[in-house]
Each structure stands twice: as structure tokens, then as C-alpha cells.
């Protein structure tokens, strides 16, 4: 389906080479200041052609708010936004029209719908994510103003190159006779997640906040591009100042909704929250997040955060953080011996303009989907609280 969310609902539309792409946002609270410039910031971070590490497709991606606001204020009615496609080159795909691109969605879309877009990948193109980013910018603005929620994503690895702070401690066994490991999430890493900013992330073209590692990542992406190949990587995201109580057990737990959102992004292959897979190697005595009373807030907090800010599917007030794995882009210029749609053998060397690595441009998409999840969860929880407060003898 092309819609996401329950109370804060987003529907995206458009294909890679159609006239426009965009979205309709339902459920935005009325009375919030909102202009196109509020949305444009994130769309500009997502747009192609920002560096030689991304596709050279030249799109301005200027957003137009079509409805739902008046005099720069939200009305509480559906907000329609569109972005014009202006640099399509369908002829780049003419030679590929006889082939389903290996590991791309060409074949599966044809099998599902009985017809496929002849150029650009149609709905499976990353152009579809423009609507997500636009909607996410609205959600993020509300969350920041109402709750102080901050969302920052960054590239944590490209291929085998990872930032040092993202390396885990699980490679060192504590005792030769003990087969358990230390917690993979160090205090240093948690401090890093607590202070990292988008300005620091955007200082490098790769969007990795560790300069030395970013340079190596850039070299790796450049090598893939020069070889007409591609490479994958990971994006880590932290959500700060998350209210407690978000998430709907049992099937709409907060981490389940985040996983749903992140795995709906094109090219994603994995999702890990908190200590992730590495936490499976740790004994409970080393992995449990012990509670303490926060002197500033008077509330309980945790000394560590292996849970990633979620326990029992509900936010506990700590930072929510997770890592998403993105595969290498499927459309590459390397010659591949594969079959045509008619079953005959051939050699495909893809043409067109494509990202050699998607993770640098995936940053605002990940942030947007995180904002949509938290926004929807906040509205659901607030409706529960409001209903409860109407009871005269609520306990």
C-alpha cells in the first residue's frame, strides 16, 4: 500500500519519470506554523546531484504546498505537497527494457501488476521517498516544538569500513572459561549518540561524522563508481527526548513500527535496535539496563541503554537508536550475463544515472520515517491519555 500511519497518516504518489511526486498528510494538528521552507531543508538534503558520490540526475526538488495551510498556518485539514520531476531521461532505459535488472524490482512488479513502468523503476524508484521526506519534515517540526524530540541519522559504515565508535566490544571474551561477552554498547558510544548533530553529519559528503573514516568511505564509493559498480552500507539513527509510553503492544510495538518503516525504504536489508544481534551474545547480567532515579526529572532512567530506549515495545524515555542495512544498488554498469523477459540469454550493462551507494542520500529518508513513526505513536498515546482523563475517578 502507499499509505503509512494511523492518526498521522501519509499517502505518497508518483513514479520516477512521471510529472510529479508527492504526498498527502492527514492528521496534522491545526495551528502550527508551516511554510515550504520548513519542508525544503530536508528535501534539499535528499536531492540528487549533491556530490560526485551520488547520481548526477539534476533535480531541484522544490516543494509546493497545495493545501492544508493558510497564511503559513496548518488548518488541520489534509496537507497536499508535490515536487515536479524535471530531469527525466527515459531513453537511458530503452536498451534495458528487455531485461529484468538483477536484484531490482522490475520482475516482481511485472509479476504482481502484469505491467511495469518502462523507465526509471516506477514506484520502486527512490524518487518515491520525496513524499516521505516532505511528510516527515512536518512531523519532525511538530515533535521538536511540542516535545523537544531530536532525530539525527548518519552513515555508520560503507562496505567493510565502519566508524570506530560504531565498533562493538564483543570481540573480546571476558574470561577464557566464560563464553559470554561484554555489552557491545559502550558508554562512549552512548555519549556520542547523545550529542551528535546534523551539522556535524553534513560536514562530509558521505554524511559520516568521523572525518578520517568518511574519507575512506568516499574513496570506497568512488572506486565502486569508477568501476561502474556499487556498494552498500549502514545508517544509524538516534531519536532523543522521546516521551515515555509510546508503542502499542502487542503487534504495534514501537520497535515493530520502526522496523516496518525502515524496511519499507528502498534497498533496505536489515534493522537492529539497541544492542541488536551483538546483544544476543551477552549474558543477562551484563546486558540488563539497571534503573536509577534521575535527580533532575525525578523519574527513573537507565544506567545503560542496550534496549535502545524500548522495553516491552514501549518507549522508556531513553534515547531510541537503531541501525539499518542498505544493500548495494542493483542498477550497475558492469556487464552481467542474465536472462531477458522472454527467457533468452543476454548480457546487460545498465545505463542511466544511478547512485553508486545509497546511504549518503538515505539519511533524511531514515530521519523522516523515524519522525512519522514517533508522531503517529505520540498522537495515539495522547488520545489514550485524553480519554482516560475524562473519567471522574481515573486511578
Curated annotation (Swiss-Prot):
**Hey, which pathway is this one from?**
Metabolic intermediate biosynthesis; chorismate biosynthesis; chorismate from D-erythrose 4-phosphate and phosphoenolpyruvate: step 7/7
Q: Look up the signal peptide feature and give its range.
A: none
Q: What is its EC number?
A: 4.2.3.5
Keywords attached to this Swiss-Prot or TrEMBL record, sorted alphabetically, are: Amino-acid biosynthesis, Aromatic amino acid biosynthesis, Lyase
BP-aspect Gene Ontology terms: amino acid biosynthetic process; aromatic amino acid family biosynthetic process; chorismate biosynthetic process
| Class in the EC hierarchy, top level | lyase
What intrachain disulfides are recorded? none
* Presence of keyword Amino-acid biosynthesis: yes
Q: Which GO terms describe its cellular component?
A: cytosol; nucleus
Tell me its cofactors.
Answer: FMNH2
Please give the catalytic activity noted in the UniProt record: 5-O-(1-carboxyvinyl)-3-phosphoshikimate = chorismate + phosphate
Recorded hits in InterPro entries, A to Z, give: Chorismate_synth, Chorismate_synth_AroC_sf, Chorismate_synthase_CS
The UniProt transmembrane annotation reads none
> Subunit info?
Homotetramer.
PANTHER family linked to this entry: CHORISMATE SYNTHASE
The record's similarity note reads: Belongs to the chorismate synthase family.
Q: What is this protein called?
A: Chorismate synthase
Record lineage: Eukaryota, Fungi, Dikarya, Ascomycota, Taphrinomycotina
